[in-house]
């Protein structure tokens, strides 16, 4: 199982990399724009924040297949083992095929349907990213889409992994993992929810109180 953070916040990545068993960091154009750092600055900083060990993802901006391929080459010139995110449009599928032939790994992104995701995997994408909460917000069923996509990949494109994205709650992420997803990417607020547990804090405080009462200290 691969756990990613979906962010451009370098300081947060450095902090959470100490706590979480992170596989890397995903970004998208909106996330990068919010951080106001160009990719040639941001990506090396994220690489360093992960201790030089994690996988990074960044997205093309072009809309034609040929221009997407050029974007991908530029991104790989910044980080040579980067996974290139390509929106799964008709032109995106064509770009994924070309990039596969060039040995450049891709993630099919902006996936709103199981068939769409399967096509990106068949075209050669190593990862497929369904948008769970965005599907729910549009009246769809994000988790069911993930279930169907995972089944399709298991049957017809087992070399590809579902990297589920767009979460508002830890429960959504857990449901994706229960459906068999091999990878998820969490926004910072959801990642924090995973480790924010008032009941656990209360239990630890009670242990300290009892120990202090018995031994006059909180250390062993």
Curated annotation (Swiss-Prot):
Upper lineage: Bacteria, Pseudomonadati, Pseudomonadota, Gammaproteobacteria, Enterobacterales
NCBIfam families: fsa_talC_mipB (TIGR00875), PRK12653.1 (NF009296)
Compartments in which it is found: Cytoplasm
PANTHER family: FRUCTOSE-6-PHOSPHATE ALDOLASE 1-RELATED (PTHR10683:SF40), TRANSALDOLASE (PTHR10683)
Protein name: Fructose-6-phosphate aldolase
Record-level GO BP terms: fructose metabolic process
Keyword Transcription regulation: no
Subunit and partners: Homodecamer.
Keyword terms, alphabetized: Carbohydrate metabolism, Cytoplasm, Lyase, Schiff base
């Amino acid at each position: 199982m691969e756990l990613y953070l979906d962010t451009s916040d370098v300081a947060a990545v450095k902090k959470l990399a100490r706590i979480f068993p992170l596989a890397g960091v995903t970004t998208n154009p909106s996330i990068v724009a919010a951080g106001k750092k160009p990719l040639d600055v941001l990506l090396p900083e994220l690489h360093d924040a992960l201790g030089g060990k994690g996988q990074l993802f960044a997205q093309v901006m072009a809309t034609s297949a040929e221009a997407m391929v050029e974007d991908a080459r530029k991104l790989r010139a910044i980080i040579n083992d980067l996974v290139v995110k390509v929106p799964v449009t008709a032109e995106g599928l064509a770009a994924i095929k070309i990039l596969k032939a060039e040995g450049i790994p891709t993630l099919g992104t902006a996936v709103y349907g199981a068939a769409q995701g399967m096509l990106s995997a068949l075209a050669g994408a190593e990862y497929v990213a369904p948008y769970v909460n965005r599907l729910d917000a549009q009246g769809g069923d994000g988790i069911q889409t993930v279930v169907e996509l995972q089944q399709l990949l298991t049957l017809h494109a087992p070399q590809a992994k579902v990297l589920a994205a767009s979460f508002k709650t830890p429960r959504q992420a857990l449901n994706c993992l229960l459906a068999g997803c091999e990878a998820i990417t969490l926004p910072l607020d959801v990642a924090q929810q995973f480790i924010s547990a008032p009941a656990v804090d209360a239990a630890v405080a009670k242990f300290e109180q009892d120990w202090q009462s018995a031994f006059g200290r909180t250390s062993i």
